[in-house]
Every structure is written in structure tokens, then in C-alpha cells.
Amino acid sequence: SAASDVYKRQEENLEATVVAVVTDENRLEMTWRGDKIVDLSRDFLNTNGVTQHAKVEITSVDENKNYRNEVPTCLESLSLADALKANLSRLEVCSQKGLVERFDSSIGASTVLMPYAGKYQLTPEEAMVAKIPVLEGETDTATVMAYGFIPKLSRWSPFHSAAFAVSESLAKLACVGCDPSQARLTFQEYFERLNDVPSRWGKPTAALLGALTAQVGYKCPSIGGKDSMSGSFNDLDVPPTLVSFAVGMSEASKTVSAQFKRINSTVKLLELPIDDETGLPIYDKACLLYTSP
């Protein structure tokens, strides 16, 4: 019963209040000080109000300006050594350690991977890994979460950006030893104010279609998310943003950290298979790459 559930929560030092009771009468009723102030049919609520429509225009992309195939302008005329140093200072690449240190990653004493690995804690980890809380004993079960988003790619093509965001978040799970085929996704979306401009509506539409394509390709569904369509101030607009968060389960004892484990370690690059015609990941090959031992 609702009352007994409240008592159980109080035993665990959690505040709980009964706010509703589910019945089989197919109606939503709300009372205030003994008076019924709402009485609606569930069938009416299921219609979800008036159906809304918007005109959408998805603009084609310039294949010659694909961010993944371009050398950033600030690096073009530099030598390899100078370009490497300059690249490390770019916002998309530079260290985020100052920001990371503002958050306490040790709360709850369940952290498996600290944000930075290695003797000097300078190697950023690919994902968050933490044991699940248990009332008694010890557990080896851990939750794993990683994100994916490439801002400059998003400006070029929201469709491709969303597909690669999903790919990146799942790849990071694989890097720490979590099986991405069992993961679930949640998306954080942030776009400019759409108004009634079809080309503006086309950006979130393209991003969602790109994310859907990736979900189908990886057989990995998104089960939640949060969106905002208010990213405009005067004549400034946020870039089209769809950040993919991949969440999975793993074993803490099998987690792989990012730092080198010994001298003379071999470093191998496992490239994401890309379709030359579409510029998108080849999902079936990527799945094999992510799940291979």
C-alpha cells in the first residue's frame, strides 16, 4: 500500500509523501481542500492536446568542408612540432583539468576510475566508472557512463554530428572494458530559437535523424534525454548541439584505465570504419570493432 511504502522510505531516512493513487476508473481527478478541482478522462489526456505541425528544411552540406577531413586554419602553415603544440591549445583539445577539479569525484567512496589516471594524474579517462551502492557487503558491479560530441562537426552537419556523437560515446565505453552492445543512451540537445523558420527547424530534425540512424545501426536505443530550443541571444546562436551519453554496466575488476601500464607499451589505432560515400560510420563493422576481445 501507499502508506506502507512511505513507512519503508522513512526507515531508510528518505522523505516521502503520497501525491497520487492509481485506480482503474480511467479518469484523472485532483482535489484541493476537499473540493474536486480537476476531473478529466484519460482518453482525452492520451490525445496529448492539439497536433502541432512545422515546416522543415534540411539544407545539404558542403562535402569539401567536412570538418573530419580538414586541417584547422590555425595549423595549416605550421611544422608538425609547432602544429602539435598549437593543436593542444585549441578549445576542442586543450586540458579540462581545471574544470574537472571543481567537482568531487570521490563522494560515496564508490569511484573506480578517478578523472585523471597515471602517476601524476595527467591522463584523462574516457568514462566515469563507479560501483553501485549496496547496503551490506561488497560488490564488483559498476556503472559506466561516457559522452560524445564534436562541436565543429556539429556546425558542418547536425546529422553527421549526432551519428558520430553516438559512436564516440559507445567507443569510450569499449575503451574502459564495458560492453557497448548492452548500453543505453540519453541525449542532451541544445539548439537556437526556432521561431517559424524552416531552415532552423531543419537543424534539430537533422540531428535527431542522425541519432536515430546510429541507434538503429548499433541496435542501441536512447531511453531518455533533455532538450532546449532557446539557445539564442540577439544575433548570437548556439551551434546545433546533440550530446550523446552512453550508460552501461560492467565489472569494476575488469575496468581498463587510460594510462600506460609499463615501459615500451604498444599503441595501436583502431579506426572507426567510415563509408566514403556518406561520410557516416559503417555500423555493422563498428559493432564488431567495439565488441571484439
Q: What label would you give each PLM region?
A:
Residues 1-292:
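Glycine/proline-enriched, intrinsically flexible loops and inter-domain linkers
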